[in-house]
Swiss-Prot record:
Keywords, in A-Z order: Riboflavin biosynthesis, Transferase
Enzyme Commission number(s) of this protein: 2.5.1.78
S-S pairs: none
GO BP of this protein: riboflavin biosynthetic process
Binding residues for 5-amino-6-(D-ribitylamino)uracil: 18, 49-51, 75-77, 108
Pfam families listed in its UniProt record: DMRL_synthase
Record HAMAP family: Lumazine_synth
Protein name: 6,7-dimethyl-8-ribityllumazine synthase
MF-aspect GO terms: 6,7-dimethyl-8-ribityllumazine synthase activity
Species of provenance: Bartonella bacilliformis (strain ATCC 35685 / KC583 / Herrer 020/F12,63)
Enzyme class: transferase
Reactions catalysed: (2S)-2-hydroxy-3-oxobutyl phosphate + 5-amino-6-(D-ribitylamino)uracil = 6,7-dimethyl-8-(1-D-ribityl)lumazine + phosphate + 2 H2O + H(+)
Amino acid sequence: MTQKLHINPHLLIVEARFYNEISDELLAGAVSVLQKSGVSYDIITVPGALEIPAAIAFAEKDKTVFYDGYVALGCVIRGETYHFEIVADNSCRALMDLTVHQQLAIGNGILTVENEKQAWARAKQGEKNKGDFAAEAALCMIALKKRFGDNR
């Protein structure tokens, strides 16, 4: 369900490249939705999911470019250590902090899965691609912000 907007929003896709092929699929899904919606977007890459919220915060403070919303894309696969919980929990918490405390429109497409098979099931085009869902969510949140008076 592509959002119909009365404005031409500009979004930033922040993509973690830790799992390159999975990231490619998530990005393709997000880009497809944004292109079909007729909005403009930029893409930046970061090393991993933990860096996504910081990149969004940096972009938000930049006064030379304005983004109406953000799409966070990445993949965290459980390993043998506690690192999975740290990355999954803290990247999600930091995105929620940005959403709630700074009122940013963010679509979260960071996969947090048990194994690579689950990641592919959520990243492949034409299936349950979470990149498209994240882009749709960002567009929806931009529309809600406009509805409730954010006229930037």
